[in-house]
Amino acid sequence: MAQLRVTQIKSKISEKQNQRDTLRSLGLRRIGAVVVREDNAQNRGYVNTVAHLVKVEEID
């Protein structure tokens, strides 16, 4: 199954609380943090919410 590599590239300072919560749900705590998540609708929604703060790569 395909997976997503999500890297936080911008700070969450001065972002809305729901975006901060979304980063925490993804497991991202600091700039440069990387997590690998399953590619499903839920995780795509999380990534879409914070798209301006993260970089996403698809991996097989």
From Swiss-Prot:
Keywords: Ribonucleoprotein, Ribosomal protein. One of its GO terms (biological process) is translation. Disulfide bonds: none annotated. It comes from the Bacteria. One of its GO terms (cellular component) is cytosolic large ribosomal subunit. One of its GO terms (molecular function) is structural constituent of ribosome. Part of the 50S ribosomal subunit. NCBIfam families: rpmD_bact (TIGR01308). Belongs to the universal ribosomal protein uL30 family. This is Large ribosomal subunit protein uL30. It comes from Clavibacter michiganensis subsp. michiganensis (strain NCPPB 382).
